[in-house]
């Protein structure tokens, strides 16, 4: 089992109103930042539905000098759209990304579109080089779509092989599965 202290981060969904955004930036973020998280992350919404509000929240938090990672899920976006967003993040000094497959709206996906998280990681790494620290999702209790433990491990390894720097998990209830997961990753 790893003896390294776990990193804690806080995940935001972009507020729908200006009042909610103001509260998130002026009250919530400073209060949570006092707990010394490794970073904050901001979700992207299914199919990039919150793309603009994600960018605004991420930029404001970054301008306050706080480490923030936008979620980047392709959700059917083509490589040009994802590449343009990566260029914008780089120009704004964003160095950490959370690369996810994300929830795909029905009817999305196709030959010119990224389909799996490892493809997105490889695309980010190819386009941005070492500029970005790429976080990916990991599932100590096994991804709901995984056929087996082994297939889930293979997917995780594929993301790391594609260029991911580290993996994050969501809150979970089975602490034993988390420690088993850490042992598996260390092996």
Give the residues covered by each predicted segment.
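Structural preference for beta-strand elements that scaffold enzyme active sites
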Residues: 5-9, 38-41, 67-71, 96-98, ...
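Active-site-adjacent structural elements that line small-molecule/cofactor binding pockets in enzymes
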Residues: 82, 129-187
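Short, acidic/polar
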Residues: 18-32, 54, 79-87, 147-158
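Glycine-rich anion/phosphate-binding loops
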Residues: 74-91, 111-116
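Active-site mouth loops of central-metabolism enzymes
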Residues: 7-24, 46, 68-80, 133-151
């Amino acid at each position: 089992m790893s003896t390294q202290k776990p990193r804690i981060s806080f995940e935001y969904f972009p507020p729908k109103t200006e009042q909610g955004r103001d509260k998130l930036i002026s009250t919530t973020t400073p209060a949570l930042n006092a707990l010394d998280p490794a970073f904050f992350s901001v979700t992207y919404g299914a199919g990039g539905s919150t793309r603009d509000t994600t960018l605004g929240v991420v930029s404001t938090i970054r301008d306050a000098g706080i480490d923030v990672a936008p979620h980047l899920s392709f959700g059917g976006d083509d490589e040009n759209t994802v590449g343009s967003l990566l260029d914008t993040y780089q120009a704004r000094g964003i160095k950490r990304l959370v690369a996810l497959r994300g929830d795909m709206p029905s009817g999305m996906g196709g030959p010119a579109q990224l389909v799996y998280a490892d493809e997105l990681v490889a695309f980010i790494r190819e386009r941005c080089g070492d500029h970005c620290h790429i976080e990916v999702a990991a599932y100590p209790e096994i991804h709901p779509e995984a056929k087996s433990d082994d297939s889930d491990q293979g997917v995780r390894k594929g993301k790391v092989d594609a260029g991911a720097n580290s993996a994050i998990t969501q809150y979970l209830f089975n602490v034993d599965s988390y420690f088993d997961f850490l042992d598996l990753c260390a092996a």
